[in-house]
Swiss-Prot record:
Similarity comment text for this entry: Belongs to the KdpC family.
Domain of life of the native organism: Bacteria
GO MF terms, alphabetically ordered: ATP binding; P-type potassium transmembrane transporter activity
Keyword Transferase: no
Protein name as annotated: Potassium-transporting ATPase KdpC subunit
Gene transcribed to yield this protein: kdpC
Length: 193
């Protein structure tokens, strides 16, 4: 019996050291050396203060800001601990109510509703934490944001274009706009104006 226990203990200790200590230490060192910004949460700073992460959406509801996708985390929007699949099915009456409420909020904020509303402005993402919207959703909001900030529409459109990221490697994903980065660029442009 003793001859069976010793190898089990040795294997347990070795595997614990390799998978619990060595492997995480090597990956952490690699991440810090090769991708330090990403390994530390892709934090965005302004005037030396962290204002958010490029990977987690934030709640913007003032008309002078671009709005991101709906957060599906409740009761606190963009709560990373509450992330998860949350979109309602297409036949669920609650989805229609949420979409109508979001369209009403867009209308109340002064958005021109004569054009079709991009779907990512009225539905939540699967995680409920998306930091990005489509260029169409950003373009849809340009007039409202420009009016609220008393900036030229062309100035706001240029900021949207400057903050639009294309497909990764030219083929993966879709073009997108990081809402936090765009809103920070808007604040900086208005301060300089």
């Amino acid at each position: 019996m003793k001859s069976l226990i010793r190898p089990l203990v040795v294997i347990f200790v070795v595997l614990t050291a390799v998978t619990g200590l060595a492997y995480p230490a090597v990956l952490t060192a690699f991440g810090q050396a090769v991708f330090p910004w990403q390994a530390n949460g892709s934090l965005i700073e302004r005037n030396g203060q962290v204002v958010g992460s490029a990977l987690i959406g934030q709640s913007f509801d003032a008309p002078k800001y671009f709005w991101g996708r709906l957060s599906a985390t409740s009761p606190m929007p963009y709560n990373a601990t509450g992330s998860g699949g949350s979109n309602l099915g297409p036949l669920n009456p609650s989805l229609a109510e949420q979409v109508k409420a979001r369209i009403a909020a867009l209308r109340d904020a002064g958005t021109d509703l004569s054009k079709p509303v991009p779907v990512d402005l009225v539905t939540a993402s699967a995680s409920g934490l998306d930091p990005e919207i489509t260029p169409a959703a950003a373009a849809y909001q340009i007039e409202r944001v420009a009016n609220a900030r008393h900036l030229a529409r062309e100035t706001v459109a240029q900021l949207v274009a400057a903050n639009t990221t294309g497909r990764q490697f030219g083929v993966l994903g879709e073009p997108r706009v990081n809402v936090l980065k765009l809103n920070l660029a808007l604040d900086a442009a208005q301060a300089a104006h």
